[in-house]
């Protein structure tokens, strides 16, 4: 399965997604700015194998980390909205969500990708 990492405003993946759909190639579009509002993420261990799932709660589609065979990191953006009503809690949620995305990118760095925040911006990383 192809993980397409982008944002809601990016229209460039649309023709690619249409082609993938016609060709029967499984994919999952992950709009990173909506991480806290449109997605549910779970980490789990089954039979001593660690995996994770990302579910789009709007479309009810899910991808397992173990299903990801390639990644197209198109235009990810930092999460910009949470369901927290308290301003301090909202700030913390957004900071934690951004840190999670960085960790996710590093955990997937050995999967074939087009575009990579890990390798394309090495000098910019503070990790």
Predicted regions and their residues:
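Conserved N-proximal alpha/beta basic substrate-recognition cap immediately N-terminal to
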Residues: 7-19, 30-127
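Short hydrophobic/aromatic-enriched beta-strand-loop microsegments
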Residues: 24-30
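Extreme N-terminal starter segment of soluble prokaryotic enzymes
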Residues: 1-3
């Amino acid at each position: 399965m192809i993980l397409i990492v982008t944002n809601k405003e990016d229209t460039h993946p649309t023709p690619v997604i249409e082609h993938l759909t016609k060709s029967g190639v499984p994919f999952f579009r992950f709009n990173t700015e909506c991480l806290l509002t449109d997605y549910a993420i779970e980490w789990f261990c089954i039979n001593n194998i660690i995996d994770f799932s990302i579910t789009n709660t709007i479309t009810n589609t899910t991808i397992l980390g173990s299903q990801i065979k390639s990644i197209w990191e198109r235009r990810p953006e930092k999460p910009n909205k949470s369901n927290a009503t308290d301003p301090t809690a909202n700030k913390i949620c957004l900071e934690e969500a951004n840190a999670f995305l960085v960790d996710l990118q590093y955990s997937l760095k050995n999967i074939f990708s087009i575009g990579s925040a890990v390798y394309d911006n090495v000098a910019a990383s503070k990790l």
